[in-house]
Amino acid sequence: RYGQVQITVNDQEPISVEGGSSLLAALTDRKIFIPSACGGRGTCAYCKVKVLEGGGPVSPTETPFLSPQELADGTRLSCQVKLRQPIRIEIPADLLAVREYEVRVESIVDLTYDIKRFRFRLVDPERIDFIPGQYVQLLTPTYPGNNEEVYRAYSIASDPGDRTAIDLIIRLVPNGICTTYCFEHLKVGDAARFNGPYGEFRLSETDADIIFIAGGSGMAPIECLLHHMRNTRSTRKAVYFFGGNAVRDMFMAEDMARFERDLPHFRYIPVISRPEEGDGWTGETGAVAEAVDRHVEADSAAEAYLCGSPGMIDAA
């Protein structure tokens, strides 16, 4: 046992915590929320903080995720830093504004065979301020088959004009801790918790043309950005390529049609890579990147916003 260990954050008054745990876990217990999407396994690299003193040696788990400059300035993965001695750290000021929200499940809607839309009504506090494109971390409690609390990151999909509820679009991951909880255990009326908001994914404040590219639950942040464009009466030219393997992977066509009506310079182009006979699909086929090439001039100065599987993003 290491007894009590002091953590000094941004040179403020030290906080005292029980030693032996990870820095990430200790900060979370004290309601200081650092982004993390892998349950503290050291695989997402979201939980970076600058350790000025007392972090101990950098572990082999961390080094693949840290650039030479980050290693030089003391950046660490907070989930891999064990609290064994007094530690002094520096975190971005905006993370100190992140807080925890108690919410209630208001609705659950099937979008496809493996994607659902969850609406969470805020209870305490009753409002959330966020920038369109940001995400929250949903808490998964223990349940049969899962004996640990974990957080998972999900982008906000809903209209930022309503700050009293948020929608998350969640795709079922086979054996995924959080998605199994959401799909098999979470019911309308249940209480839940998340923290946030986080993230730098947002629309630039330029007049450049926009290319959105997404697939699956990557729809969420793009939908939020489209709501924002409609709310601000944006006149920017935008085209949205949404990819799926088959017709059954496509959803929200009516919502996209409404955005096309409300945004005079917006086009929605769904793309199916492998349409099946009998689907009656008459739209774009093949890889999303190929559809982009067909519709966007090669020398376009458009800004691209991508959200989807690593394979789709690499191809685009």
Write out the residue ranges for each language-model feature.
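Ferredoxin-reductase
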Residues: 100-190, 244-246, 271-275
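Reductase modules of NAD(P)H-dependent flavoproteins
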Residues: 1-43, 49-73, 237-316
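A short, basic/flexible loop-to-alpha-helix module at the beginning of a structural domain
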Residues: 195-208
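Residue-level marker of beta-strand positions
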Residues: 46, 86-88, 135, 190-191
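Fe-S ferredoxin-like electron-transfer domains
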Residues: 1, 64-121, 126
